[in-house]
């Protein structure tokens, strides 16, 4: 069996003490390491911590994914490390388009969705109508949100369609 080179991409550090995605990624990475795969983590908003990561961690130079230097560093990393698979652990969000800009041939991208992409959209009205506090100002804002609901829902729908058509 051919052992692949795999990178897990996530905006922040994949410290298993921080949350569920981080914990699961850490477990999977350790299992794959034991089976002989080469694993890396790629981040663009990682804060320094004291966790001893089991794999090399690559930080993009800027947290702004539109920075051209990030794309150059990203593609050089993929080529130099002969990456076969990119596992995008942030599939619902901003990194998806950036990670797809692979200039190296035969690299597979797997985007993982860790929650329901339409969850917020399906419950938007209830969220918009919830009073944040009992002030007059909040009640006026609630009325404004009521009248803006259709427009906001349309904008969110368009954004979801564009994002998931892309994926």
Functional labels for PLM-detected ranges:
Residues 2-7:
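Extreme N-terminal starter segment of soluble prokaryotic enzymes
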Residues 10-26, 88:
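A short, glycine/small-residue-rich beta-strand->loop->alpha-helix junction that serves as a flexible
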Residues 11-17, 30-66:
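N-terminal strand-loop element at the rim of the active site
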Residues 54-76, 88-90, 136-145:
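A short, charged, and often flexible helix/loop element on the N-terminal side
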Residues 78-84:
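Glycine-rich phosphate-binding loop signature in dinucleotide/nucleotide-binding domains
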Residues 85, 103-140, 165:
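Active-site proximal beta-strand in glycosyltransferases
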Residues 88-94, 113:
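Short His-centered aromatic/hydrophobic patch
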Residues 133-167:
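Membrane-proximal helix-turn-helix segments that form the acceptor-binding/catalytic region
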């Amino acid at each position: 069996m051919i052992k692949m080179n795999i990178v897990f991409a996530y905006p922040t550090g994949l410290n298993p003490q921080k949350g569920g995605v981080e914990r699961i990624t850490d477990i999977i990475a350790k299992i794959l390491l034991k089976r002989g795969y080469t694993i890396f983590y790629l981040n663009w908003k990682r804060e320094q911590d004291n966790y001893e990561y089991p794999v090399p961690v690559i930080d993009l130079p800027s947290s702004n994914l539109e920075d051209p230097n990030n794309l150059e560093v990203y593609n050089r990393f993929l080529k130099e490390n002969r990456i076969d698979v990119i596992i995008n652990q942030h599939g619902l969000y901003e990194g998806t388009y950036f990670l797809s800009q692979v200039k190296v041939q035969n690299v597979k991208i797997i985007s993982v969705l860790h929650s329901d992409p339409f969850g917020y959209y399906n419950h938007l009205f209830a969220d918009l109508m919830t009073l944040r506090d009992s002030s007059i100002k909040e009640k006026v804002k609630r009325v404004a949100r009521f009248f803006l609901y259709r427009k906001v829902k349309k904008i969110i729908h368009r954004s979801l369609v564009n994002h998931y058509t892309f994926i």
